[in-house]
Structures are given as structure tokens and as C-alpha cells.
Regions:
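Membrane-interface segments of envelope glycosyltransferases acting on lipid-linked substrates or membrane lipids
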Residues: 1-356
Length: 356
């Protein structure tokens, strides 16, 4: 498991349930990034050999679950879902399984996967309605057992910060337009298209801030160099607190091409009041409505992306209107407390269903 919105949600959700008085344990692979980050969130951690689908991992997880006597096991990826599904069948009084699915990559329809989703798992939670509909339509899941619970954002962490102050905090210049992205550096997040769009943006001296790290970093750095943009692109790396980076931006861009639920970073930007440019990948349209809460462009289209960025940089009133509408839309629907309330209900429904 790497590090991105999925892992941040896992730890934030765990911390939230701990604060509400629940007993929570994170099971993770030794040496994994999420295991390293868990203490910073105050989340109890048990490391197990569960990085691969192997009998040793099943046995270790079964022993841990037997000792802990949990009510619910919430899995988040293919590997942990398979290991947990087998492990609980080794227990006399097993916990129920709830699977959270974070991406819109198609789920296979082979017999094993059908068993995992339809029989072994009590409930499935998705991070966007588009993902829920996909599982019902393409995989035949019972609609009553699948629900969309997008990631919740702590609004207090994204209170408006004066732009000049934010730029001083993160070391960005005060006198140039700055476009930014917060995302793990994966190919489908669209970083390359955003870099290419910078060569087409007509607003003078526009800079790009790339916040995040990941497998595409070296590739992107070479591409930035090849495009002659080294002086105009800032690679900020992974940042625990992205609020000042968002506060420093004139425009937030997330040009994803695939796989998205409701992206956590796009929600953060909207809570922070930053005008947004994005695409209609995955469940993004659930919060990004073109001309209402964001500007939405076709995926993999640097020219369209550049045009939208120029439009927001030139028309600050438009940016203010979109940002205000976006914040008004997401605040009552995508807050942290809302997510925790809905996940609590999902877990309780799973437990009740298992008793029938």
C-alpha cells in the first residue's frame, strides 16, 4: 500500500472513530507507509505479513482477529479483502466484513470475485455514487448492500488563509499566478497533461506547484526539463498539511483521466475556496459541475486545460463565484462528521444483517 487519498481516509476515519469512543486497530504490513504514518494519527497499529495473498498472511490475520474479537473488519484493497474473507472463516464467532472501494477501476466478474463481493462481504462502501452504480450494473451487486459514502473533510483545517501569508509559509513567490495540484504522482492523475498545459497558458509568468509524491515523479521531472519549464514548476513532495499550499493557489487543477471516486484533494480545494479546473473522470461530476462549481474540461486535453486556467486567471470574478458555489455545495454534504455518521450506520447495518 502506498500513500494517497485512500490511506489518508483510512487513518482519518480511524482517528474519528477513536474520538467517538470506539475501539479501532489498524492491521498493516511492516515497513508500509501507512504503518509509519499511523502513530502520527494516534491510531493503534498491529503489523502483520499481509502484503500478499499468502497462507501465512491468512493465518496471522486469523490469529489477530480471534484475539481482538472485533465486530467489524473494514478492508480497502484486493489483497486485504481476500485475506480477511478467508481468515474470518477460520473463526467461530467472526466479525462482519465491510469493503470500502476507493477507485472506479472495473471489478472482475470471475467466480472468485463474485463470491468475495456477494457472499463474503456484508456491505460494500464506495467513495462515489458512480462507483456504486458501476458495481450494481456491471457486477450484479444487490443495491441494498452497496452505498456511496464519499470522503469527509475537516472544514476547520481549510479556513481561509490570506494568499500572501500562505505563499510565504510554503516559499512560493508573491507576484506571479500559481496553478497547483495535490495528488499522488500516478499516470492517471493527469500531471503530464497539466505540465503540457503550462506551455499553452497565455497568462504571463504562470507557475505550477505539484504537491505530492509517487511512482511518476522522476518521469515528470524529466518531462518538465524537456519542456524547458524547470524554473516554472515546483515539486513540493509529500506534505502532511496541504492547507497552506492550497491557500497559495490562484487555481487548483485535477486533470484526472480515470479511476476517481470523489477525490479528496478536489474536496479540500473546494473547502479552501480555491477555483477549480478538473475533468469528468469517475465520480468527479458529483461535486464538479461545469460553470457552477468548477470548470470541467475533457481528459488528456492540455489545450482545453490551458484555456480553462487562462479563463480563471483573467476573470477573477468568475473564479470567486465558482469557488463560493463549490464551498456552499460541499460543506453540508462532505464534512468529516457526515462521513463518520454514515460509516457508523453502515457498520451497524452490516452487523444487524449478519444476525438475520
Amino acid at each position: 500500500m502506498g500513500w494517497g487519498g485512500q490511506e489518508i481516509r483510512i487513518l482519518t476515519e480511524a482517528r474519528g472513530f477513536l474520538d467517538r469512543g470506539h475501539r479501532v486497530v489498524l492491521y498493516a504490513t511492516p515497513g508500509s507507509r501507512i504503518a509509519a504514518e499511523a502513530p502520527g494519527y494516534g491510531v493503534p497499529l498491529v503489523t502483520l505479513p499481509i502484503g500478499r495473498k499468502r497462507p501465512a498472511g491468512v493465518a496471522a490475520l486469523a490469529r489477530a482477529l480471534k484475539a481482538a474479537r472485533h465486530d467489524v473488519v473494514n478492508t480497502h484493497s484486493s489483497t486485504d479483502s481476500w485475506l480477511a474473507a478467508v481468515a474470518v472463516r477460520m473463526l467461530r464467532d467472526p466479525p462482519v466484513l465491510v469493503r470500502t472501494r476507493h477507485v472506479s477501476v472495473p471489478v472482475p466478474n470471475d467466480p472468485g470475485t463474485r463470491w468475495l463481493y456477494r457472499k463474503a462481504t456484508a456491505r460494500v462502501v464506495t467513495t462515489g455514487e458512480a462507483l456504486r452504480l458501476q458495481l450494481v450494473r456491471d457486477n450484479g451487486l444487490d443495491p441494498a448492500r452497496v452505498e456511496s459514502i464519499p470522503t469527509g473533510i475537516d472544514a476547520s483545517a481549510y479556513a481561509a488563509l490570506p494568499q500572501d501569508e500562505a505563499r510565504r509559509l510554503v516559499g512560493l513567490p508573491l507576484d506571479v499566478p500559481i496553478v497547483g495540484i495535490v495528488a499522488t504522482l500516478r499516470s492517471w492523475k493527469g500531471h503530464r497533461h497539466l505540465v503540457d498545459s503550462l506551455t499553452k497558458v497565455s497568462t504571463p509568468h504562470t507557475m505550477l506547484a505539484i504537491v505530492g509524491d509517487g511512482p511518476q515523479r522522476e518521469v515528470l521531472e524529466r518531462h518538465v526539463d524537456a519542456q524547458g519549464l524547470v524554473g516554472r514548476v515546483r515539486f513540493a513532495g509529500q506534505q502532511r498539511d496541504v492547507a497552506p499550499w492550497l491557500g497559495a493557489l490562484d487555481v487548483f487543477a485535477l486533470p484526472s483521466t480515470a479511476n476517481e471516486g470523489v477525490p479528496q484533494a478536489l474536496l479540500q480545494a473546494m473547502f479552501a475556496g480555491v477555483p477549480c479546473v478538473t475533468t469528468a473522470a469517475g465520480a468527479i461530476p458529483e461535486i464538479a459541475r461545469d460553470g457552477e462549481t468548477a470548470l470541467v474540461v475533457p481528459p488528456a486535453d492540455p489545450a482545453a486545460l490551458a484555456s480553462a486556467i487562462d479563463r480563471l486567471l483573467a476573470d477573477r470574478a468568475l473564479g470567486t463565484r465558482l469557488a463560493s458555489a463549490a464551498r456552499a455545495y460541499v460543506t453540508p454534504r462532505f464534512g468529516l462528521a457526515t462521513m463518520l455518521d454514515r460509516m457508523d450506520k453502515a457498520f451497524r447495518r452490516a452487523i444487524e444483517d449478519a444476525k438475520r
